[in-house]
Design a protein with these regions (language model features):
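Nucleotide-activated chemistry modules centered on ATP-dependent adenylation/adenylyltransferase
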Residues: 1-262
Length: 262
């Protein structure tokens, strides 16, 4: 497991509970608090959100473990095909291109700077093509083989594994990113940049699935999307940024029609 070091209490419970229920060995990498704080600030400037270390670590660390222990087969959850407008008739492979384009946005070398050394980012580096090919590592997305219905899957893991939900900043759904206490900051950045964030994403999907009406979706969006997350105070404290600097950087990243936002 890659530990983003922003675990909520419910997230910690769910992780260690499922390890007990499944009776499996477990390897976890936890980056230092100081690295997370420095990365979270640099990430905002570099890729336009606070979570480069999450994006890169969750992709790179499992691949490093696969190469080290000669594990050729990795099963991920859903691919981008589950949430974006493109239609993929073939399975979406998790490879170096997917890692850079969809997950990390920037490589560990591109994140290296005066404040962050290359050595500190060694676990955020994807193995070379030669290393992956030598082991024969293949990654698939489970959503390419079963109907990906998050609502039903959550019901299943709650019933059979005691998985817990909680209030999550930035959305009305109590299972989305419930393991992370900083997800509200990630989504609030999107709101400042684009004028909408995750409540819009989730409500749109629920309207398409027939779980709510369009009017109900708009009501939820108006209430949830603009709300300033409590996690922002922690982000500002740990990165040393002022709220004025934070908002200024987010607004500077606006593009297209979003440039007309107040």
């Amino acid at each position: 497991t890659f530990n983003h070091n922003w675990y909520s209490e419910v997230g910690k419970y769910n992780l260690f509970n499922i390890l007990e229920k499944c009776d499996v060995d477990h390897i976890m990498y936890t980056p230092s608090r100081s690295l997370i704080n420095r990365s979270a600030k640099k990430s905002l400037y570099k890729i336009g959100d606070s979570c480069w270390h999450c994006h890169a670590g969750v992709g790179a660390f499992p691949l490093q473990v696969a190469v080290k222990f000669n594990i050729p087969f990795i099963i991920w959850g859903e691919s981008i095909a589950e949430h974006y407008k493109a239609t993929h008739y073939e399975p979406v492979p998790f490879d170096a291109n997917y890692f850079k384009r969809v997950s990390s946005k920037l490589s560990s070398c591109e994140m290296t700077c005066e404040e962050i050394s290359k050595r500190e980012l060694c676990f955020f580096m994807i193995p070379s093509s030669e290393e992956l090919e030598k082991v024969g590592v293949v990654g698939i997305h489970l959503g390419d083989y079963i109907f990906w219905d998050e609502e039903r899957q959550v019901e299943f893991i709650k019933k059979y594994y005691g998985w817990k939900e909680d209030n999550v900043e930035g959305t009305y759904k109590k299972y989305k990113s419930v393991e992370c206490k900083m997800i509200g900051v990630h989504d609030y950045i999107k709101f400042i940049k684009r004028g909408f964030c995750r409540a819009t994403d989730h409500a749109s999907a629920d309207v398409r699935a027939g779980l709510m009406t369009r009017e109900e979706g708009f009501d939820i969006i108006k209430e949830v999307d603009p709300e300033r997350p409590n996690g922002l105070d922690y982000y500002l404290e740990t990165t040393g940024m002022s709220e004025e600097e934070f908002v200024r950087v987010c607004k500077s990243l606006r593009d297209g029609k979003a440039k007309k936002l107040p």
